[in-house]
């Protein structure tokens, strides 16, 4: 069953922000999903001068 675990990436290692119950050596799959604020900051200005409502519509359509 999938679990969502927030983590911080430091020095080449993903460090969970809460306790995880895995046996040592367990293999897991990590899906990277950037924070919305980071995504918006990265693409700030791409749309030119867009209305707030217009940007909210785009945000609703975006799937990461």
UniProtKB/Swiss-Prot annotation:
Superkingdom as given in the UniProt entry: Archaea
SUPFAM superfamilies: AF2212/PG0164-like
Keywords, in A-Z order: Toxin-antitoxin system
Gene3D superfamilies with a match to the protein in the record: AF2212/PG0164-like
InterPro entries per UniProt: AF2212-like, AF2212-like_dom_sf
One Pfam family cited in the UniProt record for this chain: AF2212-like
Family (UniProt): Belongs to the UPF0165 family.
Function: Possibly the antitoxin component of a type II toxin-antitoxin (TA) system. Its cognate toxin is VapC5 (Potential).
Protein's UniProt name: Putative antitoxin VapB5
Biological source species: Archaeoglobus fulgidus (strain ATCC 49558 / DSM 4304 / JCM 9628 / NBRC 100126 / VC-16)
């Amino acid at each position: 069953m999938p679990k969502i675990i927030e983590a911080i990436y430091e020095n080449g290692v993903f460090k969970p922000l809460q306790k995880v119950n895995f046996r040592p050596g367990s293999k897991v799959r990590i899906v990277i999903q950037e924070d919305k604020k980071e995504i918006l900051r990265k693409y700030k200005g791409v749309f030119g001068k867009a209305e707030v409502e217009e940007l909210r519509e785009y945000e609703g359509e975006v799937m990461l």
